[in-house]
Regions:
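Glycine-rich, small/polar surface segments that engage phosphate groups of diverse ligands
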Residues: 32-105
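Alpha-helical scaffold segments in soluble metabolic enzymes
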Residues: 12, 30, 55, 59, ...
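Short, flexible loop segments at the rims of nucleotide/cofactor-binding pockets, characterized by
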Residues: 18-22, 82-86, 114-115, 133
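Short alpha-helices
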Residues: 140-193
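A short, well-structured juxtamembrane/interface segment
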Residues: 18-37
Length: 194
């Protein structure tokens, strides 16, 4: 029997809006610093969060104009080669080894915050970014997981719903990234006018 109810889902979405001071301003600051220093924003995620990572990188590059943004999930031959040759846990870390610097930002999306069972590959990439002096932004849910501890700023969607947790967290991540893009575009356009 399907226990999913769309009205309950929508009610949970409305209830799970994070507090207005939920590190959002810090995320904007980190991304603007990266833009101004001509760094690269690398995004990553597994499962549904992979599509959010790609969507956010595309929005930064196109909508905000001038952002260098790359989704680490998009090069399927490279993702497949790392998975086949070195294991799934190295898929993001391996890609970053040749690229990430102190001017760059790594953005991770994970419903459970980089839980080893589902997405330990995200935390491995974050550990490399930290060693390189890069800033790290996390988007997670539930209690934030390992990502909350590793990130310089982590937006956590508070939920404890077993049935609705994943769709609520994933939906809120997309909503929040759209807000970030709107705010970043406004600041960048104002800077260009001066």
């Amino acid at each position: 029997m399907n226990k999913f109810n769309s009205q309950t889902y929508f009610d949970l979405i409305a209830h799970c809006l994070p507090d207005p001071e939920f590190e959002y301003k810090e995320v904007v600051k980190i991304l603007l610093d990266c833009y101004q220093n001509k760094g690269i924003v690398f995004t990553m995620g597994c499962g549904g969060s992979a599509s959010t990572a790609t969507h956010f990188a595309a929005d930064l590059a196109k909508t905000c104009g001038g952002f260098k943004a790359i989704s680490l999930v998009d090069n399927i031959p490279l993702v497949s080669a790392y998975t086949n040759d070195e294991g799934w846990e190295r898929v993001f870390e391996g890609q970053l080894e040749n690229w990430i610097t102190e001017n760059d930002v790594l953005v991770g999306f994970s419903v459970h915050g980089g839980n080893d069972k589902w997405s330990g590959n995200l935390t491995k990439a974050m550990q490399l970014a930290k060693k390189r002096g890069s800033k790290i932004i996390g988007f997670s849910g539930f209690d934030g997981g390992a990502m909350k501890k590793l990130a310089d700023a982590c937006i956590v969607v508070p939920t404890d719903s077993e049935i609705y947790g994943t769709p609520v967290v994933e939906a809120m991540h997309v909503v929040i990234t759209h807000g970030l893009v709107f705010d970043l575009k406004k600041v960048i356009n104002n800077e260009r006018k001066t």
